[in-house]
Amino acid sequence: MTGLLEREALLGLLAEARREGGRLVFVGGEAGVGKTSLVREFCGRADARILAGACENLATPSALGPFTDIADRAGGPLAELLAAGADARAVARALLSEVDDATIVVIEDVHWADEASLDVLRVLGRRVDGVAGLVVATYRDDEAQGDHPLRTVLGELATSPGVERLTVPRLSLEAVRQLAAPHRADGDAVHRLTHGNAFFVTEILAAEADSLPETVRDAVLARVASLEPGARRLLDVIALVPVRAELWLLEAVAGDVLAHLDECIGRGILRTDGDGVAFRHELARLACESAVPAARRRLLHAAILAALESPPVGGPDVSRLAHHAEEAGDSGAVLEHAPAAARRASAAGAHREAARQYRRALRHGDGLPASGRAGLLDGYGLEAQLTGQASEAADAWEEAAALYRESGDGVSEGRALGWLARACIPAGRNAEAEAASRGAIDVLESLEPSPELGRAYATQAYMRMLNRDNDEGVAWAERAVEVAERFGDLETLSYGLNTLGTSHLVAGEVDTGIALLLRSFDVARENGLWLWIGPALSMLGSGLGEMYELERSEQYLREHIAFTEEHDLWPQYSRAWLALVYVYRGRWEAGAELAHAVLAQAQDSISRITALVAIGRVRARRGDPGAFAVLDEALELATPGGHLQRLGHIHAARAEAAWLAGDAERTISEAEAAYPLSLEKRHLWFAGELAYWRAQAGRADAWPEWVAKPYRLELEGSPRRAAEAWSARGCPYEAARALSASNDAADVLGALEELQRLGAGPAAAAVRQRLRALGVAAPRGPRPATRANVGGLTIREVEVLRRVAEGRRNADIAAELVVSRRTVDHHVSSILRKLGVGSRGEAARAAAALGLLDDPRHEDADGPHVPSASPRSGERAERPRPS
């Protein structure tokens, strides 16, 4: 029995990937389906050096664990870097230097990978096409579902040229019959029981029982029961050590039964693994682990813990110590090792693992003094916030603040309250954020001045800036800067300057804001404060975008995205803003593409809101369906916060969508939903656009003369000057919209030409209606069915979608379009994502709804009717006077 029936095609694909070189191949499949056996068979056939490592099934995995295994085999710079505590990027670079055409790197079970190891995989995926070798990573696809961290990594690397994915299928009925025949077993019954899972099949057949066990656990334990008692006791120990048990560890814990090791290996239960042994299948280990009585399990974990505390070479692995300490019920050891493991994981960039270790310590920390437990909560709160667990972080800092108050530590209480405020904002707990921020200031102002007071001022400034209370934001930020400079607190100085600059910038004081933000950037860069370099660039990009300084906005957004990619930070908010900038600059296809990519990856509300607004604007302006669907989602996300910087964008986009759909009443209601707030905050651009849509829909009351110049000129009835102002800011759609209000037919024809170039169907239809009313022949527009970019799709994606709707297979589509099957696979995945559907059938229905399957000869080129945005010839529109 080879155990590798029906695997030759997969082995061939792996061999092809090795021949091509520069590949990271993810091999997925359910637990026990045969991923590891496939990779071992491939490696056994290859004439290559094999560097293998595995992720551990610990409650909290060791940071960079699989790469430590690889370093033990490779030695050299990689081992030196890991011993020195290098970060994920450095580890990835060192590993890539080992990957040549004579080397295969294998990383097993990456669904258990710690965060730092996932970061290494990200870098490998982006850069592996620059080397000659092959990296293979196995994972359980049935465990990496939903919001699993590995799923995010796979999504991010989906378009990387050097990354491929293979799926190991279950064995067919015929294959199971072939495997069962030598054992005289009922192959049909085995297949019914196992559904073709290779491990289940192998274990059941290996049991060689007269009747089939009811479960795989029974099969595994039946095999174990036939071993000598000493061998069973040895398996009890090995089953409690995830991944691999070193021989020295077994000598220390189970030396009296170590002689039975060969028996366990010979019976196919264990396999050798370097200087240790491991179960041949993880499911077998789990089955054996579950059979160890609870009292014996605790005693064995305690013995393993004692041995691991004094390894024969090097220092102890605190992650493993924390795991076995908890399993042994040794709270003292947990409190010693779990915080140390958390700090080590955090330093390696594995913040999720750090948070888990702090949670582990907190589970055992009820008996600690108030200050001791508060310190653990501090650590957990920070790691939770860094990993997007805002509510958990807020709860931790709330408890920490109470404990510091109980212990009389006012400075620490104030610091915790400040962090609590920051955590409550993304958690949507705005009232708590306000109370915590004010509480931090009250506590710290009652004490001697301290750096923590400056941080509290900076947090209050940040909150005021977010709500566009710009004068208050400036005042609080100036106080933060003054305290930071007094104490030489460079981090708070950069933080305060960041908020100070942003407050000036979004108040319309653009040059002042830029200068302050660049100073914040310089302070961070010159002092190695990497945490604050990114925010300076991000605020420059998004703030300038909000002020329609689009060229400079794009420059800083690109710089921030490049910075995040270089340092493996989170780029999605800047990518969402860049998508919106593309839309305003008339690059609708690029904007929609990028916004959809953001939605595929981002979970934070602010990134999603911005991307949804970009998509909603494009859909409304093109006349595509679904504009309000995405804008409804954006509004739902933004409403709890109540911040103008979100609501202003959303209601302006919704007012425009309503106007282009011919609904004047809804245009007014959407505009007025945020107009009073925009006036209260004196926001030049939100107030200007909302006033414009109110006026277009007939609400002709006073508007403030301080609104942004392009909108002021439109409201005053100066279409040419308004168009020039929009053109100067790089906004072709807005310029054409403004020019269409001219009484000069040549101007209106020019506006129509630009709107048609952009694919702005509804606005172009309104302009053609007006031209007819003026007695001017309106040129026929492009046919909707031939217009590219419907629903945010590229021209090629539209071609593929039409063929999908016809029921064509990907291979047939590839042959017809003369592209690779893989290219068509990528197109289909992109189409499903952009259309928000989950199947080819749903995509076909969406294609019909978008008009992609209609005969273009029967379509009305004028598109839907919308109210005219311009006065009739010889008339001057009634314009409200400035207040």
Task: Give the positions of each predicted feature.
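Extended alpha-helical scaffolding segments used for macromolecular assembly and cargo binding
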Residues: 22-24, 38-42, 68-69, 102, ...
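Sensor-1/coupling segment of RecA-like P-loop NTPase cores
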Residues: 120-166
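Amphipathic alpha-helical segments of tetratricopeptide repeats
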Residues: 266, 342-343, 362-363, 401-408, ...
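Short secondary-structure boundary elements
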Residues: 31-33, 171-368, 379, 677-681, ...
